[in-house]
Amino acid sequence: MRTQWPSPAKLNLFLYITGQRADGYHTLQTLFQFLDYGDTISIELRDDGDIRLLTPVEGVEHEDNLIVRAARLLMKTAAASGRLLAGSGANISIDKRLPMGGGLGGGSSNAATVLVALNNLWQCGLSMDELAELGLTLGADVPVFVRGHAAFAEGVGEILTPVDPPEKWYLVAHPGVSIPTPVIFKDPELPRNTPKRSIETLLKCEFSNDCEVIARKRFREVDAVLSWLLEYAPSRLTGTGACVFAEFDTESEARQVLEQAPEWLNGFVAKGVNLSPLHRAML
């Protein structure tokens, strides 16, 4: 039997770089919120212990794909602790709507959905804390998708405090370029010493993203989309880009602006939600 599992997008409603560790990783403060929009992962169980991704991603080797890595990591961890039935495997396919290199967390969300779904389907019984710990080894953004609640994140993104920001409507636009995260984080002009503030203080301030100035400088497409969106509503970069978003109080306001978008702009309208669609589907 095939089951389907949501793999939602996220937005960074704000993102501030507060320092850089000796190992090169940047410390940050950011606010994650999910969207009721994303990829869909389909899983069909196998009884031969194999993991097969039926929808490979162009340019990504099978074993390097985060979906496959997440499945194998859970399999190895559960088997080592005697929590995996012999022969447990899966055929996995994905209906991909989220762009790669877009700052919407697509790959991290895919990995988290696979961890949560296979833990359920294989009846491994790993706790949410255990799954989040596994997720962190796959990527800094994976734990927030595993836990499934909007969160204020610190450290390199792994220290999470659940929060409930307003659930607004967003017009999310993709400029048609992919921005590798290292391109932003290695730029010498990236702000790296934004003062740390409490979540209470940050929620009262105007939101911004320290990566935005670099993305706009290096990618004229990002600058063009943001310049257009800012004529209509508060708008900013999510993550390290390339996607940008404008916020609205109602769906109709967001759709009216999308209808006026120039032909070169690709976008969609979605609602911000504090409970992940993945976790809502499991209630």
Swiss-Prot record:
An annotated Gene Ontology molecular function: 4-(cytidine 5'-diphospho)-2-C-methyl-D-erythritol kinase activity
Stored SUPFAM superfamilies: GHMP Kinase, C-terminal domain, Ribosomal protein S5 domain 2-like
Cysteine disulfide links: none
Residue runs in coiled coils: none
UniProt pathway: Isoprenoid biosynthesis; isopentenyl diphosphate biosynthesis via DXP pathway; isopentenyl diphosphate from 1-deoxy-D-xylulose 5-phosphate: step 3/6
Keyword Kinase annotated: yes
This protein's record includes keyword Transferase: yes
A biological process from GO: isopentenyl diphosphate biosynthetic process, methylerythritol 4-phosphate pathway
Residues that hold ATP according to the record: P99, M100, G101, G102, G103, L104, G105, G106, G107, S108, S109
Active site (catalytic residues): K10, D141
Enzyme Commission number(s) from the entry: 2.7.1.148
Superkingdom assignment: Bacteria
Catalysed reactions, as listed in the record: 4-CDP-2-C-methyl-D-erythritol + ATP = 4-CDP-2-C-methyl-D-erythritol 2-phosphate + ADP + H(+)
InterPro entries xref list: GHMP_kinase_C_dom, GHMP_kinase_C_sf, GHMP_kinase_N_dom, IspE, Ribosomal_Su5_D2-typ_SF, Ribsml_uS5_D2-typ_fold_subgr
UniProt keyword terms in alphabetical order: ATP-binding, Isoprene biosynthesis, Kinase, Nucleotide-binding, Transferase
Function: Catalyzes the phosphorylation of the position 2 hydroxy group of 4-diphosphocytidyl-2C-methyl-D-erythritol.
Subunit note: Homodimer.
Family: Belongs to the GHMP kinase family. IspE subfamily.
Protein name (Swiss-Prot/TrEMBL): 4-diphosphocytidyl-2-C-methyl-D-erythritol kinase
Species this protein is from: Escherichia fergusonii (strain ATCC 35469 / DSM 13698 / CCUG 18766 / IAM 14443 / JCM 21226 / LMG 7866 / NBRC 102419 / NCTC 12128 / CDC 0568-73)
